[in-house]
């Protein structure tokens, strides 16, 4: 679908990494976009108020409704006039489903699924950076579409695949190749990782992201989630999706076709490029990000993934092959384990170990009925996965 020349846009997760960069793209192209609503968790109230004032939005929503009084005061301080303020998850879902031309979902976590579904049902084009919507929600998300091609992937890897797929038909695709920077511990062996601290793991060599995504990138769980997302977004089975480590993060992913040709998307790492395409596709906007400088010598390297040191990708593959419920448990247990690690309650290697232990506990019950009937069933399963993860973490 071609986005209207002056599109109304709602930004979910506006104070996070995706949201702030999305607003930066929009600020550079005011003739193309009008921001009508912003939603955020509530941790950065002053920034949210400043964004509302800068973009003259009509509504702001916070997941944490206890932050409404502080937000109202911050809006007044920022000079934002006539802004409707709402709170709680239902208010964010309602905003997402209000019928904007485009909804950019930059929320982290499976809490982003219901807003994604609401946006699709309302007919909005969904610029999706919330990979958990696909990992945990699967067919619940896709069945909410009211037309074909309603989801524009915003993750850099999936945007790269999406762009590369234009070079052939689905039947001509041999495999997808998802690239990984390798994270801050590339080249480390498992025995070297026992004493890794949150401070070390939060130092990513390439990307500036939120804390949970940064930890996921260091364990390569993020790459495992991306394999799941790629398989479901592009209808390619997991055995035809490879992962290669590319430390320079210039090639963002590739598609290999049946004739032996490999098509890739390459650019210096800058999330504004896939965000901009997610907002404007199929059109491209000028001067969004810097291009590769072909006047300078450069070396791009690719190396195989060390599955022994980083078992998260293989674990994700097993879950993808098993069922949608397995991938939801994978995601929920991982979120709990990452939060525990960030709070110094779980050692680094305990993150993926905890996730695997939860999956082992729940495997038999998950296989009986592999698909969710509704979001409530998914939420209940995630709660159980989180509870079991917490039990294991508390025994550490």
Curated annotation (Swiss-Prot):
Q: Where does Mn(2+) bind?
A: 155, 157, 226
Asked if the record carries the keyword Disulfide bond, the reply is no
Q: Which InterPro entries match?
A: DXP_reductoisomerase, DXP_reductoisomerase_C, DXP_reductoisomerase_N, DXPR_C, DXPR_C_sf, NAD(P)-bd_dom_sf
Q: Which cofactor does it need?
A: Mg(2+); Mn(2+)
Q: Which UniProt keywords apply?
A: Isoprene biosynthesis, Manganese, Metal-binding, NADP, Oxidoreductase
Q: Which residues of this UniProt protein bind 1-deoxy-D-xylulose 5-phosphate?
A: 131, 156-157, 181, 204, 217, 222-223, 226
Q: Which family does it belong to?
A: Belongs to the DXR family.
Q: What is this protein called?
A: 1-deoxy-D-xylulose 5-phosphate reductoisomerase
Q: Which organism is it from?
A: Bifidobacterium longum subsp. infantis (strain ATCC 15697 / DSM 20088 / JCM 1222 / NCTC 11817 / S12)
- UniProt lists the gene as dxr
């Amino acid at each position: 679908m071609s986005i209207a020349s002056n599109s109304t846009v709602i930004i979910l997760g506006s104070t996070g990494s995706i949201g702030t960069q999305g607003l930066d793209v929009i600020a550079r192209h005011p003739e193309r976009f009008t921001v009508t609503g912003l939603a955020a968790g509530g941790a950065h109230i002053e920034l949210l108020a400043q964004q509302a004032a800068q973009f003259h939005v009509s509504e702001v929503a916070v997941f944490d409704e206890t932050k409404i009084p502080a937000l109202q005061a911050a809006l007044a301080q920022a000079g934002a006039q006539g802004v409707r303020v709402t709170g709680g998850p239902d208010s964010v879902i309602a905003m997402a489903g209000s019928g904007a031309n485009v909804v950019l979902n930059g929320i982290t976590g499976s809490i982003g699924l219901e807003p994604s579904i609401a946006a699709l049902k309302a007919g909005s084009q969904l610029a999706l950076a919330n990979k958990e919507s696909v990992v945990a929600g699967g067919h619940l998300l896709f069945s909410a579409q009211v037309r074909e091609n309603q989801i524009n992937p915003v993750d850099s890897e999936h945007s790269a695949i999406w762009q590369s797929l234009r070079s052939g038909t689905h039947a001509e695709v041999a495999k997808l190749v998802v690239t990984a920077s390798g994270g801050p511990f590339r080249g480390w062996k498992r025995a070297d990782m026992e004493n890794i601290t949150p401070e070390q793991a939060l130092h990513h060599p390439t990307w500036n992201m939120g804390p949970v995504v940064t930890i996921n990138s260091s364990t390569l769980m993020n790459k495992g989630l991306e394999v799941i997302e790629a398989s479901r977004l592009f209808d390619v089975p997991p055995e035809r999706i490879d992962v290669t480590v590319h430390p320079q993060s210039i090639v963002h992913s590739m598609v290999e076709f049946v004739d032996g040709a490999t098509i890739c998307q390459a650019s210096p790492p800058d999330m504004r490029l896939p965000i901009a395409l997610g907002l404007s596709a199929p059109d491209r906007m000028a001067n969004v990000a810097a291009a590769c400088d072909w006047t300078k010598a450069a070396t791009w390297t690719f190396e195989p993934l060390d599955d022994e040191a980083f078992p998260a990708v293989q674990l994700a593959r097993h879950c993808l092959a098993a069922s949608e419920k397995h991938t939801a448990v994978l995601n929920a247990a991982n979120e709990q384990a990452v939060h525990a690690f960030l709070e110094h309650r779980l050692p680094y290697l305990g993150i993926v170990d905890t996730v695997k232990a939860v999956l082992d506990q729940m495997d038999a019950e998950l296989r009986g009925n592999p698909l969710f009937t509704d979001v409530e069933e998914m939420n209940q399963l995630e709660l159980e996965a989180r509870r079991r993860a917490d039990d294991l973490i508390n025994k550490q």
